[in-house]
């Protein structure tokens, strides 16, 4: 049985003070959660948030990292810096990173490997655009992203990582993926993992849904067999909304 994982991606929101206030409010609301709870603040908020979650069931993730150990990469963060802070998870290959910052499946793969070297659990994002969806090449696109992004890993590593399926076409477009579409597509992603690493590994991999998840949609989504959690955007910025999702 896979333990559900619900992660809040705060994106470029919340000052340090606001971040601490949000976590303070969130802690008592999610203390009895049956799923793994993760918050992913900005880099500058990580130390304060890590301090605030001590003794709670909330884990902390970063939103990105570089694949090199150190060097002349102005504005970037190395994995060992996150490891030293005590960060547990790191989001890799988010659609916004791919869209605005030239993230590719190859760089995703480098980052995934490096994350494991530094005891970080990657939340690896994949998803297709509206154009790709309407061109009926969803499976081809996802297969390419997974086969490159998750290549050359050990079975043990793949079992530990989390995959987040974000249908880019359903984010901010007014179009939504039905629960059936989400379940079917996540089932397909699991099949790709099975082809690469075998059935027992695919059965253990947790795959989240990340297409505009809200308190009103989560229960039906989590009732679906293939969906193991959610990568939550805007709704994770309000403690009560995020708690409602966590306590689905």
Swiss-Prot record:
This is Triosephosphate isomerase. Belongs to the triosephosphate isomerase family. One of its GO terms (molecular function) is triose-phosphate isomerase activity. GO terms for biological process: gluconeogenesis; glyceraldehyde-3-phosphate biosynthetic process; glycerol catabolic process; glycolytic process. The keyword Isomerase applies. Transmembrane segments: none annotated. The active site is at 94 (electrophile), 166 (proton acceptor). It comes from Clostridium botulinum (strain Okra / Type B1). Substrate binds at residues 9-11, 172, 212, 233-234. Its EC number is 5.3.1.1. It catalyses: D-glyceraldehyde 3-phosphate = dihydroxyacetone phosphate. HAMAP family: TIM_B (MF_00147_B). Its main location: cytoplasm. Keywords: Cytoplasm, Gluconeogenesis, Glycolysis, Isomerase. Pathway: Carbohydrate biosynthesis; gluconeogenesis; Carbohydrate degradation; glycolysis; D-glyceraldehyde 3-phosphate from glycerone phosphate: step 1/1. GO terms for cellular component: cytosol. Homodimer. PROSITE patterns: TIM_1 (PS00171), TIM_2 (PS51440).
């Amino acid at each position: 049985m896979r333990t559900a994982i619900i992660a809040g991606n705060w994106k470029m929101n919340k000052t340090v003070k606001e971040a601490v206030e949000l976590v303070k409010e969130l802690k008592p609301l999610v203390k009895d959660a049956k799923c793994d709870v993760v918050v992913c603040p900005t880099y500058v908020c990580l130390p304060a948030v890590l301090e605030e979650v001590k003794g709670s069931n909330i884990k902390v993730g970063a939103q990105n990292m570089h694949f090199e150990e150190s060097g002349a990469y102005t504005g970037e963060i190395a994995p060992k810096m996150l490891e030293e802070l005590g960060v547990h998870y790191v989001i890799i290959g988010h659609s916004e990173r791919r869209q605005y910052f030239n993230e590719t499946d190859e760089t995703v793969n480098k980052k995934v490997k490096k994350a494991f070297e530094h005891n970080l659990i990657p939340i690896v994002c994949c998803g297709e655009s509206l154009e790709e969806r309407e061109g009926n090449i969803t499976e081809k696109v996802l297969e390419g992203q997974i086969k490159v992004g998750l290549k050359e890993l050990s079975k043990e590593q793949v079992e530990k990582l989390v995959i987040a399926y974000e249908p880019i076409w359903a984010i901010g477009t007014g179009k939504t993926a039905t629960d059936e579409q989400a379940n079917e597509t996540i089932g397909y992603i699991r099949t790709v993992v099975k082809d690469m690493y075998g059935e027992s590994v695919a059965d253990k991999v947790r795959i989240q849904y990340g297409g505009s998840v809200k308190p009103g949609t989560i229960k039906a989504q989590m009732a679906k067999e293939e969906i193991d959690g959610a990568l939550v955007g805007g709704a994770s910025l309000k403690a009560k909304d995020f708690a409602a999702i966590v306590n689905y």
